[in-house]
Swiss-Prot record:
InterPro entries: Integrase-like_N (IPR017856), TACO1_YebC-like_2nd/3rd_dom (IPR048300), TACO1_YebC_N (IPR049083), Transcrip_reg_TACO1-like (IPR002876), Transcrip_reg_TACO1-like_dom3 (IPR026564), YebC-like (IPR029072). Pfam families: TACO1_YebC_N, Transcrip_reg. GO terms for biological process: regulation of DNA-templated transcription. One of its GO terms (cellular component) is cytosol. The keyword Transcription regulation applies. The keyword Repressor does not apply. This is Probable transcriptional regulatory protein Reut_A2522. The lineage of its organism: Bacteria, Pseudomonadati, Pseudomonadota, Betaproteobacteria, Burkholderiales. Keywords: Cytoplasm, DNA-binding, Transcription, Transcription regulation. GO terms for molecular function: DNA binding. Its main location: cytoplasm.
Length: 241
């Protein structure tokens, strides 16, 4: 990826998410509930629950809210039943987009996602149409200036798959999804706290957008991210700042 893009794009996405803190809490409560429902209420034996709890704590969510979501998931409290749905589609220039949702009404969600695609110059694809262009992995991004050799040693010892230094000086570490929490803990114990850390669908190749096309593509991504049922949006589009 071009040096200007990796750090700027991921930091921009994080800032935009932080600006919608209230919505972030709503999404995280849904994710914690579903994670507990599918894998049980013990984060030590449920990596997905551990990740969602870590995100909630990073977002300053009160512990009571987190515990209520877990209880709802394991059946201790009444609540809405959510199902996971993934939609795939295309933006401008055939850029690939994955939209992960948690919903209590599949009909409503697919209509809203399809409308967002069509309104902003994209189109829905079929299941599997773009997912093969991404790799499911844990991803950590460290700021330019992080000592590369020490980070690489710590990351590989922790079980990371790869460590890449981008042209802009930022360093990216990837690992298997199920090892995310262990790698994160090991890196932090070694003194390395990532600016951004998450389990993602990482694009294998990227499409650069500049000028008017960048503006249009960003509007499509924003429209999808702003839908209530949408949890995550992944794309291989790189938007020029």
């Amino acid at each position: 990826m071009a040096g200007h893009s990796k750090w700027a794009n991921i930091k921009h996405k994080k800032a935009a998410a932080d600006a919608k803190r209230g919505k972030i809490w709503t999404r995280l409560i849904k994710e914690i509930t579903v994670a507990a429902k599918l894998g049980g209420g013990d984060p030590d034996s449920n990596p997905r629950l551990r990740l969602s709890m870590d995100k909630a704590m990073d977002a300053n969510m009160p512990k009571d809210n987190i515990q209520r979501a877990i209880q709802r998931g394991v059946g201790g409290l009444e609540g809405v039943n959510y199902e996971e749905i993934r939609y795939e589609g295309y933006g401008l220039s055939g850029a690939a987009i994955i939209v992960d949702c948690l919903t209590d009404n599949r009909t409503r969600t697919v209509a809203e996602v399809r409308h967002a695609f069509s309104k902003h110059g994209g189109n829905m694809g079929t299941e599997g149409s773009v997912a093969f262009m991404f790799t499911h992995c844990g991803q950590f991004l460290f700021a330019p200036g992080t000592p590369e050799d020490k980070l690489m040693d710590a990351a590989l010892e922790a079980g990371a798959d790869d460590v890449v230094t981008n042209e802009d000086g930022s360093i990216e570490v990837t690992c298997p999804p199920n090892d995310f929490s262990a790698v994160k803990a090991a890196l932090e114990a070694a003194g390395f706290k990532a600016e951004v850390a998450d389990v993602v669908m990482k694009p294998q190749n990227e499409v650069d957008f500049t000028g008017d096309d960048a503006v249009k593509m960003q509007k499509l991504l924003d429209a999808l991210e702003n839908l209530d049922d949408v949890q995550e949006v992944f794309t291989n589009a790189v938007i020029e700042e």
